[in-house]
Amino acid sequence: MSYAKEIIQQSIKDIKLQKSRARRRQIEKLLNYYTGTDTWKYISGKEGNYFDSASFNEVPPYNMNLTKKFIDKKSRIYTLSPNRDLGNKSANNQYKELLFYKNLRMKHIERMTNLVGTPAVRVMWEEDEGKKCFEYRVVYYYDAYFTPPNPYHPYAIIYPILNPTQEVDYTEPVEFAYWDDKVNIIYDEDGNIKEEYPNPYGVLPFVFPRDTEQIDDFYGEGSTDVVATNEHLNILMTELMLGLRFQMFGQSWASGVYEDQPIARVGSDKLINLPDGGRFGIESPGGDPQKVLEIAKG
């Protein structure tokens, strides 16, 4: 193979890897805003540096979970359990036993579809304590693989396996799962195969729900607009709290004092000793908090 072809293929791999990592970060952000987990890092941290870290010595970052409220309110299909009728009572009872988890899982699947766009749902058979039924598990982040003529139906999927990382003594490396219609492989982050099983279903046991028809990409956009609104409100309300604090206490200033003896903010029962000609005062910043609240409501 010529150097030109090698460079082209490597550049394509690099671009695809960057897109995959960017998509994973985006899904993590959507999930974090839905669960209200560490959302402060998106307004003051490496993900989004809108505030100096010293600002949060004055007030804590505002954390409004608008995303969860909106997604849960929007997801109303499974508010009431559907009526599934196969034509006779005996068949209905047997079918109901097979779908023991379905109504509960579908409610969550609908919410995650509205949130992340196109989750992968693993349909699996479960036998536990005499109960035999279908089970449904959501995979939020994954990489799907397609044959060239068909960009709509994946033939294989790879995703990271959830691990008990909160356990103090858990030190195992990250594991991944590979599925196609013939095999299921578990491998670690170094590519070492740990387990391999034949696929008992004979088909890829995943479905990919979406709230809109596929347009230019297999992976749906998700509720990035809702999360962006949530982020803007968190920034706005944090600014408001900082403004209120400075309006209440003001910003102290001094002139005619020695540089090596700065004046610190002190209590109302303390005296401040100023040199001859020294001046001290407190300024309140401008701004109208009521207008900020009106913007937030709008």
Listing of model-derived features with the role each one plays in the protein:
Residues 1-133:
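Extended, helix-rich architectural segments
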Residues 187, 191-298:
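Extended, charged amphipathic alpha-helical segments
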Residues 4-8, 31-34, 43, 51, ...:
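Extended hydrophobic/Leu-rich segments
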Residues 1-32, 179-218, 233:
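N-terminal start-of-domain structural block
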Residues 51-54, 59, 65-67, 74, ...:
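Intrinsic disorder/low-complexity detector
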Residues 4, 60, 106, 137, ...:
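Generic alpha-helix initiation/capping and coil-helix boundary signal
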Residues 106-216:
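Extended, regular secondary-structure scaffolds
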